[in-house]
Amino acid sequence: MSSRPGSGVHGYRADVAFDGERELPDGVLVLVDGELIVGVEPGSAAAPADCPVTHLRGSTLLPGLIDAHVHLCGDSGDRALDQLPSLSDTDRDEIIHRALSAHVQSGVTAVRDLGDVDWAVADHRDTAPGQPHVVASGPPITIAGGHCANMGGEASGRDGLIRAVQQRAERGVDIVKIMASGGLMTVGTDVMASQFTLEELRLVVDQAHRQGLPITAHAHPVPAVRQAVEAGVDGIEHCTCFTAAGFHIPPQLAERIAASGIFVCPTLGRDPGVPVPPRIQAFLERMGLTWELRRPQIRAMYDAGVALIAGVDSGINPAKRHGVLPEAVIELVDTGASVSAALGGATSRAADACGLAGRTGRLRAGLAADLLIVDGNPFTDITALRTPVTVVARGVQAVSQA
């Protein structure tokens, strides 16, 4: 046994398992004491004496999922981001609470918030057992009037950019986010244009790293993605690589992203029963952008060895509501990625990207007891992720349909 369990040990046994990095086809017995995993045993192992065991036959056990791109202040409504500045503290707190509940109900036990307002998420990251871990960036750095400027992160000029990073360090954020291009959810910004010069991006990256902080860049068009890579970012959000001809990532750019160890969150996943917001749908139709065109672009990154992680951009509109991360994993498998790679992008690799590797993301003694048990076997049918039957968040059963 990896660690001696105490008297409060509870076991979770499954016929198939994924430990965050590889499939365990013969199952697993995970022993939990309090908030921590204290043992990871073969599925056939006997449980300690007097240890209750939850065993759902035909189930698969894996680490709790991680949504690496959320906006907890967003209520998933049509005006989720537009209304942020007008929300009262009480309304914001209630939205955040509902969002966290929706995530854990879907099997998500950790989230990375990449854009709030008034530091509402960054200042309230201490969630209780039974709720997801929260990693936060605070308001993203953007140009005056730029993408998500209403979150309060506008900065310009060398001194202004340095102050912006310093402010985030003083607030104790976990990561810095910068809007390297315009975005689809902010009227008046150009999603096909870069928002900062390469020199400015390099300055912000350098300042973040001096503060010991990783930095991720929102980037849609190829020039903005290339700038982010050249500036030395640690992550890229969306990485849609818009061109006049659709979605396309030059092979050399994909190879450079992979060689640099940059994490890419392509923000896949949406509620399949909800239509895309009209203004986004209009843009996609105008540009001729379809999933059939996006699929090979993502596959090209996967084939190049890019470290892909799962994140939905949760909370920004009805189609991107909180709690649909399983759809991001399902879509990645649809591009041709292996099930293990897709699940790793929502567990161990996401934990690495979010600075949570020492806390969660793997079935390992000493890490948080963040567990997901689904009905069925995602290695034969990835849609099994849609049917969580037990969710354990830091040792607390937040969902139990056993």
Where are these regions (language model features)?
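C-terminal cap of metal-dependent C-N hydrolases
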Residues: 34, 346-348, 365-402
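Metal-associated gating/positioning segment near the N- to mid-region
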Residues: 59-126, 223, 231
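Histidine/acidic-residue-rich catalytic or RNA/ligand-binding cores of hydrolases
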Residues: 76-79, 186, 225-233, 250, ...
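Active-site mouth loops of central-metabolism enzymes
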Residues: 81-94, 146-163, 214-219
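Divalent metal-dependent hydrolysis catalytic cores, especially in the metallo-beta-lactamase
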Residues: 93-122, 131-142, 173-186, 213-214, ...
